[in-house]
C-alpha cells in the first residue's frame, strides 16, 4: 500500500493475541483491541466474584494490557477499545450480565489502565447486532464518560447486519439514531456483501448527520440538567401513563398495547381493505384501533 502511494491510515483489528497487537503497532496507525478477549477467556464459566477476587482480576488485566499501551504511546499510535456485545468476557458476564452496562464497564476498565500510563489517543466502540442494545450501550457510554470527565471519540457500527435492504435498514436504525443524538465520530456499515457496497450507505448517513448538525446549534450535554425530563435515555423502559377509555372496547395508555390510529375514507366495516391499503399486506387487526376520519374528528372535538 505504501509503495502504491496510499497514505490512508490503517487499522489492525486484533482478537485473542496480544503478541499480534504488539507487532501490528509497528506497522499501522491504529490498533483495535477487543476487551472481551484480549486478556480474558470466554469459557462460559459461571463464577461468583467477590470484590477482592474482582480486584485481583483487574490487576491481572493491568499487567496484560500495559505492554500494548506503552508500545502505542512510544510509537504515536492510536487505539480503538472496541467492545462487542457478542464477546463479553466471562468475568464481565458474571458481574454485569449480557447487558449494555457490561459492554460499557468492559471498555472503561481498559480506558482506566491506559490513562494510568498517561495514554489518551483512544476511541471507543460499543457494537452489537441488535440496534436496540447498540444504541443503549453508546448512550450509556457517553453518560459514563461525561461523569468521569472523559471525552473520547466514538466509532459507530452495527455488527452482523447481514445483506440487502434489511441490513441497510438495521444499520440506519442504529447508526442514524446515534448520529441524530449528536453521537459519533467515525462510522462503519457492516454488510455481508462486497465491502464497496458499504461505502454509499455510510456516506449517505454521514451526509444526513452533517446537514442536521449544521442546521442546529451545538448542544452542551452537561448544560441545564434541571430541564431534563423523567425518561432515562440509557435504558428501554416504557413511559408510565394513565389509562384512557375511548369507549367500552378501546383503551389507551397504561399497560395497553399501543394502538394504530389512521385516517381512511372506507366504511369502518371494511377494516380488512383499510389495513391492506395502508400496510400493503394482510394484518391481524386485533390490536389496532380503527375508525373513520369522521369518527376521529368527533372524538378530537
Put a short name on every predicted segment.
Residues 3-8, 16-79, 83-122, 129-147, ...:
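Alpha/beta enzyme core
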Residues 7-11, 30-32, 76-80, 121-125, ...:
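Structural preference for beta-strand elements that scaffold enzyme active sites
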Residues 15-17, 36-38, 82-88, 127-131, ...:
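Active-site beta-loop-alpha junctions enriched in small/polar residues
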Residues 52-61, 93-232, 238:
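Catalytic alpha/beta core domains of metabolic enzymes, predominantly
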Residues 223-269:
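N-terminal amphipathic alpha-helix/helix-capping segment at the start of soluble metabolic enzymes
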Residues 253, 262-269, 274-287:
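Small-residue-rich
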Amino acid at each position: 500500500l505504501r509503495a502504491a502511494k496510499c497514505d490512508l491510515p490503517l487499522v489492525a483489528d486484533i482478537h485473542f493475541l496480544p503478541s499480534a497487537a504488539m507487532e501490528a503497532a509497528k506497522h499501522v496507525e491504529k490498533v483495535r483491541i477487543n476487551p472481551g478477549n484480549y486478556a480474558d477467556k470466554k469459557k462460559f464459566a459461571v463464577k461468583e466474584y467477590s470484590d477482592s477476587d474482582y480486584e485481583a482480576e483487574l490487576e491481572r488485566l493491568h499487567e496484560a494490557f500495559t505492554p500494548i499501551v506503552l508500545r502505542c504511546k512510544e510509537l504515536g499510535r492510536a487505539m480503538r477499545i472496541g467492545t462487542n456485545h457478542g464477546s463479553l468476557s466471562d468475568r464481565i458476564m458474571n458481574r454485569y450480565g449480557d447487558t449494555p452496562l457490561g459492554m460499557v464497564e468492559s471498555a472503561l476498565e481498559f480506558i482506566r489502565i491506559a490513562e494510568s500510563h498517561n495514554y489518551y489517543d483512544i476511541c471507543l466502540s460499543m457494537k452489537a447486532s441488535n440496534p436496540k442494545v447498540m444504541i443503549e450501550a453508546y448512550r450509556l457510554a457517553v453518560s459514563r464518560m461525561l461523569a468521569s470527565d472523559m471525552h473520547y471519540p466514538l466509532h459507530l457500527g452495527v455488527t452482523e447486519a447481514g445483506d440487502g435492504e434489511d441490513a441497510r435498514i438495521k444499520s440506519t436504525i442504529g447508526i442514524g439514531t446515534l448520529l441524530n443524538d449528536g453521537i459519533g465520530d467515525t462510522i462503519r456499515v457492516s454488510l455481508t456483501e462486497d465491502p464497496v457496497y458499504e461505502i454509499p450507505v455510510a456516506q449517505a448517513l454521514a451526509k444526513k448527520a452533517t446537514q442536521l448538525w449544521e442546521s442546529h446549534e451545538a448542544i452542551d450535554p452537561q448544560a441545564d440538567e434541571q430541564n431534563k425530563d423523567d425518561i432515562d435515555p440509557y435504558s428501554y423502559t416504557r413511559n408510565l401513563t394513565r389509562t384512557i377509555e375511548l369507549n367500552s372496547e378501546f383503551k389507551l395508555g397504561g399497560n395497553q398495547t399501543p394502538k394504530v390510529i389512521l385516517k381512511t375514507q372506507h366504511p369502518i366495516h371494511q377494516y380488512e381493505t383499510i389495513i391492506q391499503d395502508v400496510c400493503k399486506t394482510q394484518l391481524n387487526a386485533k390490536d389496532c384501533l380503527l375508525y373513520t376520519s369522521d369518527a376521529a374528528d368527533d372524538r378530537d372535538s
